[in-house]
Amino acid sequence: MKAQLKKFILLSLNACDGLPMPQSALVGAVQNLARPGQPTKSDVEDALKAVEREGFCEGVSDEFSETTWTLTTKGIHQARKL
């Protein structure tokens, strides 16, 4: 399931066309795409951290809002192959 969640993360971020996506929206989008599997928030966040470690996306957080996520160049390339 983790591989599928990682794929859905890339697809969701790619659909934003470069705009940062808030983490709560990303988690919700991935959970919707993964139906009927019903991954938990923790499952999605674990997959998100794995995608970040692999260099496909990066998250930015500050004191004013939640973490937002975007694809890296490597992530854009990978997402376009899916």
Predicted regions and their residues:
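Intrinsically disordered, low-complexity serine/threonine- and proline-rich regulatory segments
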Residues: 1-5, 55, 69, 81
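Short alpha-helical segments that sit at the start of domains
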Residues: 1-21
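Short acidic, hydrophobic short linear motifs in intrinsically disordered regions
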Residues: 19-32
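Cationic, hydrophobic amphipathic alpha-helical membrane-interacting segments
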Residues: 33, 62-64
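Short amphipathic alpha-helical interaction segments
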Residues: 37-53, 66
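A short, conserved structural fragment
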Residues: 52-62
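Minor-groove-contacting beta-hairpin "wing" of winged helix-turn-helix DNA-binding domains
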Residues: 64-71
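Short, amphipathic alpha-helical interaction segments positioned at domain boundaries
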Residues: 73-82
